[in-house]
């Protein structure tokens, strides 16, 4: 597998409920590298652009209002297979269907307050990273324990 990047956002409910460090810890324990991190209250425009694929869905307005209602922790994680692995760490969009041990399975119960967003593919990851981060906000660095996490 090649090294890739994904966009992860801890939504306002996850921030307000104090899960930021726990969620970051799960990604670090998995062995992924954090290359971008910021906290912001997204504008309505940013939220609309981010969730544009859902523009015609009946829940779009509520989703935009929710995401822009409070602080979001936006992150870029890097590593081999990080997109698929992050999706597994996060769990099903519907928390009550999420497996125990996943972020949503352990920490959420309502689809409208499911704590976290993660890119669902390479194209989406690139779009979301470019939407939320400027190139200068991403940090290129090498972890000192890389040889202990991967043969490659």
UniProtKB/Swiss-Prot annotation:
Uppermost EC category: transferase
SMART domains according to UniProt: NDK
Catalytic reactions on record: a 2'-deoxyribonucleoside 5'-diphosphate + ATP = a 2'-deoxyribonucleoside 5'-triphosphate + ADP; a ribonucleoside 5'-diphosphate + ATP = a ribonucleoside 5'-triphosphate + ADP
Residue positions binding ATP: 11, 59, 87, 93, 104, 114
Localization (cell): Cytoplasm
EC number per UniProt: 2.7.4.6
Keywords attached to this entry: ATP-binding, Cytoplasm, Kinase, Magnesium, Metal-binding, Nucleotide metabolism, Nucleotide-binding, Phosphoprotein, Transferase
GO cellular component: cytoplasm
Record-linked CDD domains: NDPk_I
Residues annotated as transmembrane: none
GO molecular function, one term: metal ion binding
Matching HAMAP family: NDP_kinase
Assembly and binders: Homotetramer.
Function: Major role in the synthesis of nucleoside triphosphates other than ATP. The ATP gamma phosphate is transferred to the NDP beta phosphate via a ping-pong mechanism, using a phosphorylated active-site intermediate.
Protein name per UniProt: Nucleoside diphosphate kinase
Species of origin: Prochlorococcus marinus (strain MIT 9301)
Gene: ndk
């Amino acid at each position: 597998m090649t090294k890739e990047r994904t966009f992860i956002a801890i939504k306002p409910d996850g921030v307000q409920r104090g899960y930021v460090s726990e969620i970051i810890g799960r990604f670090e324990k998995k062995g992924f590298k954090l290359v971008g991190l910021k906290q912001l209250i997204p504008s309505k425009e940013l939220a609309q652009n981010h969730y544009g694929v859902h523009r015609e869905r009946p829940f779009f307005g509520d989703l935009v209002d929710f995401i822009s209602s409070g602080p979001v922790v936006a992150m870029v994680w890097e590593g081999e297979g990080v997109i698929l692995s992050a999706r597994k760490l996060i769990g099903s969009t519907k928390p009550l269907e999420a497996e125990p041990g996943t972020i949503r399975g352990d920490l959420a119960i309502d689809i409208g307050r499911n704590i976290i967003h993660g890119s669902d593919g390479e194209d989406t990851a690139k779009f979301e990273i470019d939407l939320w981060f400027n190139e200068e906000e991403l940090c290129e660095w090498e972890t000192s324990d890389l040889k202990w996490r991967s043969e490659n």
